[in-house]
Structure formats: structure tokens, C-alpha cells
């Protein structure tokens, strides 16, 4: 009887250690994916995030990571799908939701899905407080849609929130891409005169 209890306790402890080891290994894969993503190893990061998704590890964050890796690899449709899956996960924090929406809008812009990108920008404006990055992204999408006044308004807000040389360069480059260099030059001049 005493031996049976000992065997059962040892079996339970061994089982817990083995299961704990599996969870630890799954977490290590997720953490390695983050490292690979930050180091520019997008292919490896994508594979590791996909493994984390299959294992149910931090689903929203894993889908987000897979989306970013896909974005960097130029797999636009996959990126949008991953960002959408991330948004559909349970218990997505407000900050993470804003981050994912911003990434998805950026991806949709690159993919040429301007209406979808603008819809995400509008959701950002309705559900979250806008910051310089949000205004800039919305301006860039509006510019791509040839909504010049809306773009100008958003760029003005972006520069008002972040009147730095970097923001001026970003706005200038957005206008330059649309052959509207003169519109962007005023931001460069303002940054240089500060």
C-alpha cells in the first residue's frame, strides 16, 4: 500500500515535470521568435510564431508577430490575415489592439487595399486617442486615395504632435512619392528653422 502511494506520487511529479518542460519549450520557441524578429531573421521568426500559434502560446501576440514577419517578407495577404486573427483573439489589450490595427493598416496600404486601410485608420480614430504615428498613417492612406485635403490635415496634426526632423522627413517623403514635393518641403523648412 505504501509502495503504491509512493509510485503514484512519483508518477504525478514526473508527469508534472514533463508537462512543465513542454510548456517551457513552447515558451522558448515564442521568445526565440521575438529575438529572430528583432534581429531581422524574418523567415525563422515566422516559422517560430506559426509553431507558437499551433501550440496556443500567447495567441494574439503570436499572430501579431507572424503578421510582422510576413510584412517584412512581403507576404501582404498573409500579414493581413495574421493581424486579423490577432484582433479576433480573446482578451486583446487596448494597447495591443491599437498596435495591431496600425500594423494592419500599414500592410493594407502597402498591398494597395486603400479602403481597408482607411477603415482601420478610422477605427483607430474612433476607438483610441490619436498620436503622431496614427495621424501620419491616416495622412499617408488619405494621400494614396488622392484625398489631398484630408492628408494635409492629418500630416499637420502629426507634425503638431511630433515636430521633429524625423517626422518632417517622413511627411516630405510621403508627398515626394506622390510627386508633390512642394507640399512636403514646408515641413522640412519648418524643422530646419526650429
Label the model's feature ranges.
Residues 27-28, 61, 95-99, 133, ...:
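Start-of-helix register in tetratricopeptide repeats
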Residues 65, 96-103, 137, 170-171:
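Canonical tetratricopeptide repeat
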Residues 57, 91, 129-130, 162-163:
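Short coil turns that delineate tetratricopeptide repeat
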Residues 38-39, 72-73, 106, 110-111, ...:
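Register position in tetratricopeptide repeats
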Amino acid at each position: 500500500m505504501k509502495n503504491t502511494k509512493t509510485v503514484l506520487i512519483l508518477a504525478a511529479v514526473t508527469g508534472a515535470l514533463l508537462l512543465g518542460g513542454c510548456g517551457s519549450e513552447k515558451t522558448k520557441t515564442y521568445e526565440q521568435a521575438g529575438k529572430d524578429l528583432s534581429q531581422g531573421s524574418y523567415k525563422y521568426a515566422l516559422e517560430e510564431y506559426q509553431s507558437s500559434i499551433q501550440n496556443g502560446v500567447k495567441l494574439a501576440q503570436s499572430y501579431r508577430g507572424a503578421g510582422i514577419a510576413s510584412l517584412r517578407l512581403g507576404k501582404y495577404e498573409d500579414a493581413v490575415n495574421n493581424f486579423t486573427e490577432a484582433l479576433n483573439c480573446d482578451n486583446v489589450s487596448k494597447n495591443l489592439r491599437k498596435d495591431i490595427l496600425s500594423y494592419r493598416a500599414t500592410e493594407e496600404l502597402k498591398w494597395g487595399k486603400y479602403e481597408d486601410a482607411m477603415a482601420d485608420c478610422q477605427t483607430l480614430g474612433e476607438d483610441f486617442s490619436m498620436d503622431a504615428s496614427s495621424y501620419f498613417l491616416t495622412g499617408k492612406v488619405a494621400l494614396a486615395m488622392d484625398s489631398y485635403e484630408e492628408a494635409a490635415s492629418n500630416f499637420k496634426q502629426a507634425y503638431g504632435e511630433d515636430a521633429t526632423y524625423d517626422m518632417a522627413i517622413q511627411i516630405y517623403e510621403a508627398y515626394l512619392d506622390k510627386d508633390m514635393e512642394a507640399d512636403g518641403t514646408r515641413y522640412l523648412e519648418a524643422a530646419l528653422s526650429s
